[in-house]
């Protein structure tokens, strides 16, 4: 959000029309990996989540 605010502020300083920021739905990627590096033992798993946030800002 801070980056969007900085872009909008800079555009308004240059007297540009600004539309946005429009929030695009967050994309969530789930990654499942084995905890054991050697592959032996009990099957235990780690779940990691990667979130991608996107914004669209139109400068006219």
From Swiss-Prot:
Name the UniProt key words of this record, in alphabetical order. Answer: Ribonucleoprotein, Ribosomal protein
Q: Name one Pfam family in it.
A: Ribosomal_S10
User: Is Ribosomal protein one of the keywords?
Assistant: yes
What are the annotated GO cellular component locations?
A: cytosolic small ribosomal subunit
- Swiss-Prot/TrEMBL GO biological process terms: translation
Q: Say if the entry is tagged with keyword Ribonucleoprotein.
A: yes
* InterPro entries in the cross-refs: Ribosomal_uS10 (IPR001848), Ribosomal_uS10_dom (IPR027486), Ribosomal_uS10_dom_sf (IPR036838)
The record's similarity note reads: Belongs to the universal ribosomal protein uS10 family.
Quote the PANTHER family the UniProt record gives: 30S RIBOSOMAL PROTEIN S10 FAMILY MEMBER
Q: What is this protein called?
A: Small ribosomal subunit protein uS10
- What's the source species for this entry? Zea mays (Maize)
* Gene name as annotated: RPS20
